[in-house]
Amino acid sequence: ERMKVLKFLQKLTNDNLFVNRKTGVVTIGGKRWDNRSKNLKTGTSLLRDVINNKHTTTIYQNTDDERSAIALEKWGRKEFKHPDGSLPGSDVQIDIDLSPTTNTVRNPKTNRSENGYTPAEITLGHELIHSLRYMEGISTSEKEDYKYTDGTYLVTEKKQSVEELQTIGLGRYRNKYKYTENMLRREHNFQQRLSHISDD
């Protein structure tokens, strides 16, 4: 199980990752040779930031289609002040089904939305971005309307999670954060995700 999680973490980064078989702790070694043809700048940096954070993210694998990250303390969200003398942010638990899934993506040729294949490493990257945001205490529970074009149509999705818009890199958050799912998608030549709402 640990090796399977490690395999997908490894696909995101140019660093060589090791897992301690007793504790399950992941550490970074030197450069990885089998990813050398890819420049995985975003993923490499994301994993370094997650691994080097003072808080801990624990990844649990499942097979029941669950894909989520939860903060173990409420001050993983910016709406809650962390107790005096404590670090901002929270430890995190990720529950992830490592089978591929589908998401609403943009077809670059037609500019229309379609249901697109999403491999497990991209989903894992998405949850790791949530996890880093929780560990830094900048996650948010705000909601806002999100608009995008689908071919010639303007689509409005009401009361969307700002946390998801920021994590995926949608709308006005496209270039606002250091890490987004769509940056990871660009790095791996996958279509850009268009919406948090999926058809599955």
Residues of each region from the PLM?
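Generic marker of residues within folded, mature protein domains
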Residues: 84-86, 114, 157
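Structured segments of extracytoplasmic/periplasmic soluble domains
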Residues: 8, 12-15, 131-135, 170-174
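Active-site or metal-binding loop neighborhoods of secreted/extracellular toxin and effector enzymes
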Residues: 1, 118, 135-200
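N-terminal processing/targeting junctions
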Residues: 15, 102-104, 131-132, 141, ...
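Active-site recognition of the HExxH zinc-binding catalytic motif
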Residues: 119-135
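Auxiliary, metal-adjacent structural segments of Zn-dependent hydrolase domains
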Residues: 1-101
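Short acidic, glycine/tyrosine-flanked loop/strand segments centered on an H-E-D-like triad
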Residues: 91-108, 129-133
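Short pre-active-site segment immediately N-terminal to the catalytic Zn-binding motif
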Residues: 100-123
